[in-house]
Amino acid sequence: MVHFTAEEKSVITGLWGKVNVEETGGQAVGRLLVVYPWTQRFFDSFGNMSSPSAIMGNPKVKAHGKKVLTAFGDAVKNMDNLKGTFAKLSELHCDKLHVDPENFRLLGNMIVIILASHFGGEFTPEVQAAWQKLVAGVATALAHKYH
């Protein structure tokens, strides 16, 4: 179980309030599919993913990114119960979709990269540390049903 300090919670929620979920989610999932092309196998129904520009412009990638980051918002609201918050999604990704749990860690890193690019100097090392802790906690929670 991940424990967040009051300061970490404040830093995370403060930045989250400024995040454009649709834009950030689409960019994070798109970047995941470009940087780690083997992850594309889970998204056969998404249509044209023949090039980085096709992936980044794909409306289904953007829609899924929004869905992912909306769910990530639940983590921000429930930092003290990540495992419970993601129990159903963990089961879905493990039992039905058979997603490699390592992909959750990779996606978390993509989210951090996009946040850093969007917030520049505001995304200090302290802010990054708090967010890395959160995305790692979410990845662990999503991988829970695999154990």
Swiss-Prot record:
Modified residues (Phosphoserine): 51
UniProt keyword annotation of Chloroplast present: no
Pfam families: Globin
MF term (GO), any: oxygen carrier activity
Binding locations of heme b: 64, 93
Keyword Transcription regulation: no
Domain Globin per the UniProt entry, residue ranges: 3-147
Domain of life from the UniProt record: Eukaryota
PANTHER family registered for this protein in UniProt: HEMOGLOBIN FAMILY MEMBER, HEMOGLOBIN SUBUNIT EPSILON
Family listed: Belongs to the globin family.
Functional description taken from the UniProt entry: Hemoglobin epsilon chain is a beta-type chain found in early embryos.
Name this polypeptide is given: Hemoglobin subunit epsilon
Species this chain originates from: Sus scrofa (Pig)
